[in-house]
Design a protein with these regions (language model features):
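Conserved ABC nucleotide-binding domain
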Residues: 131-156
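ABC nucleotide-binding domain "signature motif"
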Residues: 90-98, 235
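Conserved H-loop
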Residues: 215-222
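Localized sequence-composition bias
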Residues: 202, 223-229, 236-314
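The feature captures the beta-strand-to-loop junction immediately N-terminal to the Walker
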Residues: 69-71
Length: 314
């Protein structure tokens, strides 16, 4: 597989997290296995494994616009973090060719104590640009962000919308080879999102590789050619975005049906339990009616005796 052809290559990538029930188990995991190894005993683990990704394979050609879709918790953000190098995979390999600009979690890559201006230079330096190169691009970045005098204020004072404006402006104006965009754009207003999408289309037409993640199916269909569908950390499908989106809709439909089916079962079970409780608490109506009849008969007999006694005296 030639490095001249592909910008991103993901091979058999898996990511496992160790989940501990309590802090003591974490301490046991740190100490006990060492003693067991020294004594040639079978090693025990004091954690549960959670596989955020399992055997994912995915390639993106240079200049291609690719998407990653899936429900919340499917592993999309984990995969992006592995591609950008902020996470290491448990197994598998990642290869990237070119300078990466990534817009991931809101505020990632920014120092909250620095001003917007200072963060522009910080991010430029991280991408390998010198001060003169950043100076030449500064006006374009400030103009696209369009946050006015807030550029001279600490980023920690920014609203989420202002932060994503500056973050996107920095990433797209610094001319990356690979642009990775997560769902952070969702916090921007509709007008700014349109500006972002136009800029993304401009970059991809100029040969920039795009890796785009969004729940907005129309944006994925418009901006990308191929997509990867993830579900519960597993690779479901890779192919044309239009075909992958159809599979994604089917998956959502199946999950929705499953949810409402379970909900209906829970409601039916709850209703039946309430009926059973009501039946158990009912008073013995038959016994009460019988007692009332006996009392009524006794009263009639008493009145009859009184009448008979009166007639005898006369």
């Amino acid at each position: 597989m030639s490095s001249n052809e592909y910008a991103i290559v993901v091979e058999n990538v898996s990511k496992c997290y160790q989940i501990y029930d309590n802090p003591r188990d974490r301490l046991k995991q740190f100490i006990v296995p060492k003693f067991e190894a020294a004594l040639n005993r079978e090693r025990r683990n004091f954690y549960n494994e959670f596989w955020a990704l399992k055997d994912v394979n995915f390639e993106v050609k240079k200049g291609e616009a690719a998407g990653i879709i899936g429900r919340n918790g499917s592993g999309k953000s984990t995969l992006l973090q592995i591609i950008t190098g902020t996470l290491t995979p448990t197994t598998g390999t990642i290869a990237t060719h070119g300078r990466i600009a990534a817009l991931l979690e809101l505020g990632s890559g920014f120092n909250p104590e620095f001003t917007g201006r200072e963060n522009i230079y910080l991010n430029g330096a991280v991408l390998g640009l010198n001060k003169n190169e950043i100076d030449n691009k500064f006006d374009a970045i400030a103009g696209f962000a369009d946050i006015g005098t807030h550029l001279e204020q600490p980023v920690k004072t920014y609203s989420s919308g202002m932060m994503v404006r500056l973050a996107f402006a920095v990433q797209v104006q610094l001319e990356p080879d690979i642009l990775i965009v997560d769902e952070a754009l969702a916090v921007g207003d509709a007008l700014f999102q349109k500006r972002c999408f136009r800029q993304i289309e401009k970059l991809t037409s100029n040969g920039v590789t795009l890796l785009f993640v969004s729940h907005d199916q129309e944006s994925v269909r418009t901006l990308t050619n191929r997509s990867l569908l993830l579900d519960r950390g597993k690779q479901v499908m890779t192919g044309l975005s239009s075909e992958v989106l159809l599979e994604y809709r089917r998956l959502l439909h199946d999950e929705e049906n499953k949810f409402y089916s379970n909900l209906a079962s829970e409601i039916a079970e709850k209703t039946q339990n309430e009926k059973n409780i009501a039946t158990d608490n009912e008073l013995p109506i038959v016994s009460i009616t019988s007692s009332e009849n006996e009392e009524s008969t006794a009263n009639e007999n008493l009145r009859s005796d009184k009448l008979s006694f009166g007639e005898g005296e006369a």
